[in-house]
């Protein structure tokens, strides 16, 4: 089975699990494609390419891999319907960016959308993502002062 076929099968399983758990089928979902690289400069090139392709990008975070070596990570983010074909198309667009710079694709994730939720996390404009620049206040992609807990996915 090819890498893309494996990713497509995983996408369908994730979507099926979310919907079987009761997540809202008609909601817009924040899709976060998890990207990593041991070389920060190459990771930044992937982020720039993704941004130029129309995606939002999160700030980079630094972690230690299983061998204790630094690894840098960020997310390529979009807000779309929870449809396998859309995520497949995103992966087909994102994977060549990673291959170009020898990046690591660590899958994608999203959040459960409760159909019975009263509160609106999307704010007054109805959009979760805003049009503000995702880079830090100083224009840097990586902020040395941010120390965040590792994400669990």
Swiss-Prot record:
This is Regulator of ribonuclease activity B. Keywords: Cytoplasm. One of its GO terms (cellular component) is cytoplasm. Residues 114-153 are annotated as: Disordered. The gene is rraB. GO terms for molecular function: endoribonuclease inhibitor activity; enzyme binding. Belongs to the RraB family. It is found in: Cytoplasm. Interacts with the C-terminal region of Rne. It comes from Haemophilus influenzae (strain ATCC 51907 / DSM 11121 / KW20 / Rd).
């Amino acid at each position: 089975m090819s890498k893309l076929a494996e990713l497509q099968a995983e996408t369908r399983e994730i979507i099926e699990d979310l919907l079987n758990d009761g997540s809202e089928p008609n909601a817009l979902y924040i899709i976060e494609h998890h990207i990593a690289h041991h070389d920060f400069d190459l990771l930044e090139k992937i982020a720039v390419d993704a941004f130029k392709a129309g995606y939002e990008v999160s700030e980079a975070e630094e972690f230690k891999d299983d061998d204790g070596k630094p690894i840098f990570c960020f997310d390529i983010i979009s807000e779309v319907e929870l449809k396998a074909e859309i995520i497949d198309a995103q992966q087909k667009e994102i994977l060549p960016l990673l291959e170009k710079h020898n990046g690591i694709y660590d899958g994608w994730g999203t959040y459960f959308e409760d159909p019975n939720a009263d509160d609106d996390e999307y704010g007054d404009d109805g959009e979760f993502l805003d049009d503000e620049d995702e880079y830090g206040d100083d224009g840097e992609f990586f902020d040395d002062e941010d120390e965040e807990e590792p994400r669990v996915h």
